[in-house]
A protein has these predicted regions:
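Positively charged n-region of N-terminal signal peptides that target proteins for export
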Residues: 1-4
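A periodicity- and composition-biased signal for non-globular, repetitive helical segments
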Residues: 8-9, 147
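Hydrophobic h-region of N-terminal signal peptides that target proteins for export
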Residues: 9-18
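Short S/T/G/P-rich N-terminal loop/turn motif that feeds into the first structured element of a domain
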Residues: 18-243
Length: 243
């Protein structure tokens, strides 16, 4: 019984921490372009973003696949909350913007081979914008948790952030699914460039060991195996900024 309550308290605590740090709503769109249509699709999204900004929406943040998963674009649309985004006035303005873009709607359909959408709660918009403004290289990890293991997965992501912080590396932004695609949680690490992303390999082994143990891991080599205890699916992608 004591063990049960200890686990219960841990799970509640982890979920409460999640609720406190992931309060901003985003729509996340993953897109694979039809063959030969990627650049045209990027231009279409840029035109739509300009029209939506004029209608009062926040500018999206996005990236282009370099290697890893099969999507070409990951687009983060800042919503704030469902109440804000679906306010009748906002909806009417977006509808008017869509009408001005009617000529491009068929092009969108022809340029997209695959699309997946997810509504997720994530970090404060100002923090994410600052990171994207200073970074041009991204590491995206997307997860489906094993049944009953979501809180453990979330805690593991925070442990990896503690490890990164101790080594002076960027911490991952954590996003938690609300509805849509199957991903329970995904993280985005933002780096200046490929060299910045790879510089952790230059950290002395002793410092890595110390940071890993301080974060709650047995050793740096056990970070991956520890993560795998909690997940059924894990996709890794490296991506670059779209300006």
């Amino acid at each position: 019984m004591k063990k049960f309550f200890a686990v219960f308290i841990f799970v509640v605590g982890a979920l409460s921490a999640q609720a406190a740090t992931n309060q901003y709503l985003y729509k996340v769109t993953l897109v694979q372009a039809a063959p030969g249509k990627l650049l045209e699709l990027i231009d279409l999204y840029k035109a739509r973003a300009t029209a939506y900004q004029a209608a009062g929406d926040e500018a999206p943040m996005w990236m282009r696949h370099s290697q890893g998963d099969h999507w070409d674009l990951l687009i983060l649309f800042p919503l704030g909350s469902y109440t804000e985004y679906y306010h009748p006035e906002r909806v009417a303005k977006r509808k008017k913007a869509d009408e001005s873009l009617a000529a491009s709607s068929e092009k969108f359909k022809g340029d997209i081979a695959w699309q997946e959408d997810l509504f997720a709660y994530g970090p404060a918009l100002a923090d994410l914008r600052q990171a994207f403004a200073n970074g041009a290289y991204f590491h995206v990890e997307m997860f489906v948790a094993l049944p009953g293991k979501f809180a453990d997965l979330y805690q593991e992501r925070e442990m990896e952030n503690a490890y990164a912080k101790a080594l002076g590396e960027p911490q991952n932004f954590i996003f938690v699914r609300d509805q849509g695609a199957a991903w329970d949680l995904f993280t985005i690490g933002v780096f200046r460039d490929l060299k910045h992303y790879a510089q952790s390999a230059d950290v002395p082994v002793q410092e890595q060991e110390k940071a890993a143990k301080a974060a709650g891991f047995e050793s740096p080599g056990q970070i991956g195996p520890y993560l795998r205890r909690f997940i059924s699916t894990h996709h890794d992608t490296l991506a670059v900024a779209i300006r």
